[in-house]
């Protein structure tokens, strides 16, 4: 065969050369065109993919942030990195960065490029810009300075080593983008993504509320670093109208069948990491709820305990609140003999793959508004009433996740609210702590947003785990590390970011955390 190839290659190539402009180019374009490829992309489909990927990469931090916020832990040092800060696993924090740019950031950028100059698609343009802010906000909040203004421009502008923008500049632009997009959205124009919009199915009014709700979230993020700007943006968001009704909750819907991209990303990752066997024993990575979380729920007689957790008794899941028990994060590498007795996420709620992923809720709006009221930035309602509404909303939203009505009995909600009233006669600090203790439970399983608020407010006042061989000296880390490859492939930009922001270290604070 080798001899035959050698024998006939030259004559064939020579013949082709002699007839270069005749026979050999006949049907060349047709032969080299993939009949299954799309020459003109369908923008609506790319938008759907950007939504899926943005939601998935926001949710897929699994054991890392779940462990860091002391919801879960593992006896396995690798899986338990988030709760143990084990030095050998620190580079795992670069995964969100690595996964974000080629997917959601690139995809939403292509959507914006396709619609921005078309005056008939003003709503599509605004919605895409809002989603781009959502994606970038989740990314910069984890890393600080990141590629932003030049991100996703490799194909369009041949920018293969994008600069890292300062987080202060990123925040300024994101807030400007939200304001411009919310203003541009109009019911007089019918250009939406329709059913390809997996969040609101093209509802312009709801997208506007989502934009102002994100403005409220990001504006409040500035309280430590620039209180005046924080107040200005929070006030503007409230005036624009934020999410206050269940029908307006920003959520991604999923199914139990089909491809994995169609499944709730938090539930799907938790299941695959640990809980597919559903017997309390054969947990692949050794994961269970952490004792800090379960002990808090039990101590506060929180009716969510039986909604979120189960203990397997003789192979059967039990939600009996009296037997729920969290596993200590200090267990050192060996599976405990009583492993089966520890609580783990419930299959019909937290692990429900066709449950919606809640991106911005009524509960979050009310908790943020309660803080704004405490600061004197909002006076139409009291901090106490907003705080109470936030608690009720956080409990009632489990109806959306479970797919049932009355998941938590109204009487138990009333009893809990009465027992945890805001201490209005105490200091602002005491009341703020109460609010963000409720955020810790009420926004679960959105561990990243809880982590963001923990860094900003210091609440809940979690006690770090001083574990042998940890990477932080027994401190809860303040940011994620850039991927190692950035030091090789984008060294100049990486070095500039590190010089400006500080050492690429887990304890270096991002701009708004300083």
Locations of regions flagged by a protein language model:
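C-terminal functional modules
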Residues: 395-514
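Beta-strand acidic-aromatic groove motif in beta-rich domains, primarily in extracellular
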Residues: 59-68, 144-146, 230, 449-452
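Amphipathic alpha-helical surface "interface" segments used
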Residues: 72, 194-206, 316-317, 323-330, ...
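Membrane-proximal, proline-rich intrinsically disordered regions
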Residues: 24-73, 99-102, 106, 110, ...
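Short acidic (Asp/Glu) and glycine-rich catalytic loops that position anionic groups and cofactors
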Residues: 26-29, 346-347, 410-416
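Structured, solvent-exposed acidic/aromatic patches
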Residues: 40-42, 75-131, 135-402, 425-432, ...
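Bacterial Sec-dependent N-terminal signal peptides
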Residues: 2-3, 8, 17-46, 53, ...
């Amino acid at each position: 065969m080798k001899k035959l190839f050698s024998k006939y290659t030259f004559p064939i190539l020579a013949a082709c050369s002699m007839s270069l402009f005749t026979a050999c180019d006949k049907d060349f374009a047709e032969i080299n065109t993939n009949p299954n490829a799309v020459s003109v992309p369908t923008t609506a489909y790319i938008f759907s993919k950007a939504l899926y990927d943005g939601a998935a990469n926001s949710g897929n931090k699994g054991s890392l942030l779940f462990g860091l916020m002391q919801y879960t832990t593992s006896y396995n040092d690798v899986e338990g990195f988030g709760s143990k800060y084990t030095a050998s696993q620190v580079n795992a924090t670069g995964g969100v960065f690595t996964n974000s740019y080629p997917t959601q950031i690139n995809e939403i950028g292509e959507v914006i490029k396709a619609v921005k100059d078309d005056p008939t698609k003003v709503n599509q343009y605004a919605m895409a810009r809002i989603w781009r802010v959502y994606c970038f906000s989740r990314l910069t909040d984890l890393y600080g300075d990141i590629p932003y203004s030049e991100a996703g421009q490799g194909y369009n502008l041949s920018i293969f080593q994008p600069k890292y923008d300062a987080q202060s500049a990123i925040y300024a632009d994101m807030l400007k983008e939200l304001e411009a997009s919310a203003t541009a959205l109009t019911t007089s124009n019918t250009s939406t993504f329709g059913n390809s919009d997996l969040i609101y199915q093209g509802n312009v009014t709801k997208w506007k509320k989502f934009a102002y709700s994100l403005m409220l979230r990001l504006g409040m993020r500035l309280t430590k670093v620039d209180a005046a700007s924080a107040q200005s943006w929070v006030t503007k968001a409230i005036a624009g109208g934020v999410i206050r009704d269940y029908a307006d909750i920003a959520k991604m819907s999923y199914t139990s069948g089909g491809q994995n991209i169609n499944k709730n990303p938090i539930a799907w990752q938790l299941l695959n990491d640990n809980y597919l066997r559903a017997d309390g024993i054969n947990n692949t990575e050794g994961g269970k709820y952490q004792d800090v979380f379960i002990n808090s729920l039990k101590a506060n007689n929180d009716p969510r305990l039986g909604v979120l957790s189960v203990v397997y008794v003789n192979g059967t899941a039990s939600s009996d609140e009296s037997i729920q028990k969290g596993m200590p994060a200090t267990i050192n590498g060996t599976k405990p003999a009583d492993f089966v007795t520890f609580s783990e996420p419930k299959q019909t709620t937290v692990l429900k793959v066709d449950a919606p992923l809640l991106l911005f809720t009524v509960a979050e709006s009310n908790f943020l508004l309660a803080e704004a009221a405490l600061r004197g930035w909002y006076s139409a309602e009291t901090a106490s009433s907003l705080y109470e509404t936030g608690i009720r909303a956080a409990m009632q939203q489990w109806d959306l996740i479970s797919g049932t009505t009355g998941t938590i009995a109204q009487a138990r909600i009333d009893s809990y609210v009465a027992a945890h009233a805001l201490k209005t006669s105490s200091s602002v600090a005491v009341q703020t702590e109460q609010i963000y203790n409720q955020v810790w439970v009420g926004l679960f399983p959105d561990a990243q947003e809880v982590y963001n608020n923990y860094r900003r407010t210091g609440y809940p006042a979690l006690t770090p785990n001083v574990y042998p061989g940890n990477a932080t000296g027994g401190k809860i880390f303040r940011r994620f590390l850039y991927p190692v490859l950035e030091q090789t492939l984008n060294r100049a930009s990486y070095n500039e970011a590190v010089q400006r922001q500080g050492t690429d270290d887990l304890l270096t604070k991002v701009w708004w955390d300083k």
